[in-house]
Amino acid sequence: MKKRVAKFVRKCFLTHGKSTTNPSSIHSLIPVRSGDWDTAPAGTAQIDTVAHCGHTLAGDFIYTVNATDVPTLWGARRAQLNKGQTATVTSMEQMEKGVPFSIVEWHPDSGSEFINWHCKEWCENKGQQLTRSRPNHKNDNCFVEERNGHIVRRWIGYTRLDAMEVVAALNFVYDVLTPYLNHFVASRRTVSKERVGARWKVTREKRSKTPYERVLERSDVSETVKTKLRLEHETLNPLTMKREIDRRLQVVFSLQKHCGIPKLEK
């Protein structure tokens, strides 16, 4: 009798609880990207958001939507207030206009600003694929994650930006900063990486190249696009652009100082 009662008591205690949350159906419809990035065609863009929140996530603040084409490292970025679905798609539309070739795939992380029905339908209507990273795997989006730091954070910094007036001013900065980086700032890509003992041996390209040069080398980019880029490149002056970027950045921080929310900047 004692054994029967003990067995009954054990069954009263469940080994696991019941979940009251169902997985979002949108995640099952947007595929997780698999495969080698080295074989990706031009127009395969990783995309992410950078929060200009300062020391607190309280209240409204500005985000930068940052995108990087994986094969060419061609970048595009726009500023928006908060990261709502409509605002994010509007930023993606504007960034697409600044990319000289057609976008064939957008690859964000699992953030709700990108993984939603509005963004999915927008991509489908344009004939573009929307894929996503594995949750909690930041390295799946490594190209744009890297540029979140050494482009957005390096140029804009960590200051809180929360004034509506600053959105237009920050986009005014990106109007010059983006072509400056694409045409004149070179980088060396990693060719191989192997472990030797306790260290990693990293082999990089022998010569640094700008995104502009990488586009010209691509066989999957049309000659019409390349000719248009060459003509644009001839009209640009890096020294003049750098001075203009600095001037526009001063406007951004001046507007934030006068129009921002002081109590949230601390």
Summary of predicted features, one role per range:
Residues 1-105, 110-266:
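Secondary-structure boundary/capping micro-motif
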